[in-house]
Amino acid sequence: DVYKRQELIQKILKIRDKILNADDLTKYQVEIKDLEREITLFHFKAVNKCLELSKSDVDLIGFHGQTIFHAPEKKITKQLGDGLLLSQLTKKKVIYNFRQNDLENGGQGAPLAPIFHNALANELNKKFNLGFPMNILNIGGISNVTSTIEYNNLGLEEKIYACDIGPGNCLIDEWMRKNSKKGYDKEGLVARSGKTDKLILNQALDNFTEQSNFEKSLDIKNFDIFFAKGLSLEDGAATITDFTAKLISNGMNFIHNKNNSQKSKWLVCGGGRKNKYLLESIKSNFDDINLNSIDQYELDGDFIESQAFAFLAIR
């Protein structure tokens, strides 16, 4: 299963790179369909293990799939995962195509987790008296934030603000894949052993224009590691991690200004919360910031996103 997972990851990365700037996905249809079936069967094995434990308790399945293309300006997004096939295999109702449905209804297709984050903020406040504003920062491939200014169970816009704010793990992971045999920088140890090239970092930040208003969803194709070309593995990892941290920090400052509070709490989920160097770099951009892993509050930060899609599926 571990081998199969790695094989699928490589296939996903390959097709994603191939269609990165495509205007039409139809010419890749056969390749996409074949890979989609493989991914669905792989998911079925995992889902089936859960069903074996409590099949009668499962009413439906929320199936997101693997994103390989996202172009909200064209109202096109593609996640690999066949909901109909998964439904046939599990004999359960499967809710899927979350992002395409959002695009067709006037949304950006991302982020979609804020409704769940908002409900989670209320539960965390009840249990731990954390208070508001409360911000949930998800550092996945892309970083997004949900700011619950004041809890409202209807999720009214003036009480909650959410947006993509920058890269998360995508650039760091890409650098590691292309320059080493590792798929990611565990705990940021490679970056920590390197030295940031300040000149290259500042030039990259000056040239980056995707963060002007935080009103559109972001995709990996909005970012590039080209600026670090020629650096050593360690120095490149450090420079790219600090670049990522600065963009995330810019987004956090935007949220601070939006909710008129510099003292709001930040709870971090997603794989990026395990990158200690990244979190330290984010903190270094603030005089004082309350930034903690969501795991400190009896939750598992690896599963917030998957729980969000179960929540959305029920709704």
Per-range role (PLM):
Residues V2-Y3:
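Short, small-residue-biased leader/transition segments that mark boundaries at the very start
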Residues N21-L35, G183-G188, G230-L231:
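Short glycine/proline- and acidic residue-enriched helix-loop micro-motifs
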Residues T26-G81:
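Short beta-strand-loop/turn "lid" adjacent to the catalytic site in phosphate-handling enzymes
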Residues S56-H64, N260-G272:
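Short glycine-rich phosphate-binding loop at a beta-alpha junction
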Residues G62-N125:
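Active-site neighborhood for divalent-cation/phosphate handling
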Residues N118, N122-V190:
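Glycine-rich phosphate-binding loop of actin/hexokinase-like ATP-binding domains
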Residues K181-S264, N275-I289:
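A contiguous, well-structured pocket-lining segment that forms one wall/lid of small-molecule binding clefts
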Residues D242, N292-R315:
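Glycine-rich phosphate-binding/hydrolytic loop that grips phosphoryl groups
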